[in-house]
Structures are given as structure tokens and as C-alpha cells.
Regions:
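Conserved phosphate-coordination/catalytic loops
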Residues: 21, 25-28, 98, 117
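Generic N-terminal amphipathic, Lys/Arg-enriched alpha-helix
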Residues: 3-22
């Protein structure tokens, strides 16, 4: 972490904390190393963007070989879809209440969207939210053993 300490020393007194500092070269090496390890084992990578919430980092991950991204909520999925991400998995079960159903339906117009579900009622509610085209939305059934 000498490189990190050098950067902190140079910035001392010039930035307010807390502040994110990303060492782009280190991050890129980590992305590439993770992807290489997974690819060597035949494992598809779908990173969770809730950690970084950064389109540029998501692009780097997909460019390195990730099959898509995982979002934590409809809003994250919308932001990444608007930035051109075409394969998104919503990891947390979503109940399509309020505006969520329409937002999910719109996402499926431009994005391969999959949503994790953990009960039959959620599947029915999501299908209803999709109107005449429930087949445009894919669901992943989550089983908690």
C-alpha cells in the first residue's frame, strides 16, 4: 500500500474526508485477475454494482468478461440500463408496488432483466405488472434451504 500512502501524502490538506480514492491501475488488475480466475474454471462472473455504484467500473468489469451485472434495486438497474448495460439481474426480491411495476416493464424493453423471487405470489405480481408480455421478464427462483 505504499502507492496509496504516497497519494494520501500528496493530497493531505487539499481534500475533505471522507473521500473515495480509487487506484485505477490496481482496480483494473483486480478486475482482470478475478475474471481470469473465474474464466479458467468456467465460471460466469456477474458483479454486484451496489458496492461501487459506478458505471465506469461496471463497464470495466463487463469489458473484462463479466456476463452482465447484478443490481440491488430497481433504481440501480435503471441507471445502469440507461448507460447501456444490457444484461441485469436484480438480486433482491422486488414487489412491483407503486411505480416499480411500470419501471420494471420499461426496463425489459431495452434490457435482459432477471429478478430473484422467493415466493409464488411475487411471480404472479411481477407477471401482472408486465401486462400482456409477462414472458419479457425472467425470474430466478431463490430457495433458502
Amino acid at each position: 500500500m505504499d502507492q496509496f500512502q504516497e497519494i494520501l501524502d500528496r493530497l493531505e490538506g487539499r481534500i475533505d474526508t471522507p473521500v473515495p480514492i480509487v487506484l485505477a491501475d490496481v482496480m483494473q488488475r483486480n478486475i482482470e485477475r478475478t475474471q481470469a480466475m473465474a474464466s479458467a474454471r468456467g465460471i460466469a462472473v456477474r458483479p454486484h454494482v451496489k458496492t461501487h455504484k459506478c458505471i465506469e467500473i461496471g463497464r470495466r468489469q463487463v469489458d473484462a468478461g463479466a456476463i452482465g451485472i447484478t443490481a440491488g434495486n430497481v433504481g440501480e438497474a435503471e441507471v445502469f440500463a440507461a448507460a447501456g448495460f444490457e444484461d441485469i439481474f436484480l438480486a433482491y426480491p422486488v414487489w412491483p408496488s407503486g411505480t416499480k411495476g411500470e419501471r420494471i416493464r420499461r426496463l425489459t424493453e431495452t434490457t435482459r432483466l432477471r429478478i430473484g423471487v422467493d415466493n409464488p405470489a411475487a411471480v404472479d405480481a411481477l407477471a401482472a405488472a408486465m401486462g400482456e408480455e409477462p414472458e419479457r421478464l425472467e425470474v430466478v427462483v431463490e430457495i433458502d434451504c
